[in-house]
Amino acid sequence: LYPEATPPAKILVSSARRATLGVKVREDNSNVVIETPKVEIVFQKESGLFNVNDKKNGTQPLRSLSQVRFDSEGTTLTFKAEDNEYFFGGGVQNGRFSHKGKKIAIVNTNNWVDGGVASPTPFYWSTKGYGVMWNTFKPGNYDFGEEEKGKVTLNHSENYLDAFIMINKEPVELLNDFYQLTGHPVLLPKFGFYEGHLNAYN
């Protein structure tokens, strides 16, 4: 269905993962907890749900609402969305900025007009202090409360889950986490911003 890249394309840079110090794992009758000095992830044994706590500021930026689902439609994650929470990212989503209450496609529609997706990126960030990047080129859909208010539903046409969750309070910090994985974008010289491209927005 999709052409194969030769050599295979990669999302991650070669030195994507930072060393993490002070990782601890503990367990009780109800939960398995993985923590670092800055972040705590709590997995509920019975339900399979999890939440992520930011130990730096005592907040819970991320909470799952259902187990990870694997089916014929791919892999799906479902998170809680708050009333005062906003979502950004997904690459070039023409005509869209904040995705709250909307659904976006993570697939190249080769459409440069309003509603098109010209250069998708499997990454978004939330004003609650977290970001998610899927390590896949497969098509995806991210629903930020269009079908059901208060719920974020993320899906990719993939038969496994490979995603990074970043926890940081400020957008710049979350973007730096993203760049740690993918590499920093290149700043073009002034002559690279050619005037002819302006016709795409008339």
Residue spans for each PLM region:
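N-terminal accessory segment at the very beginning of proteins
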Residues: 1-192, 196-198
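Short, acidic/polar
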Residues: 202
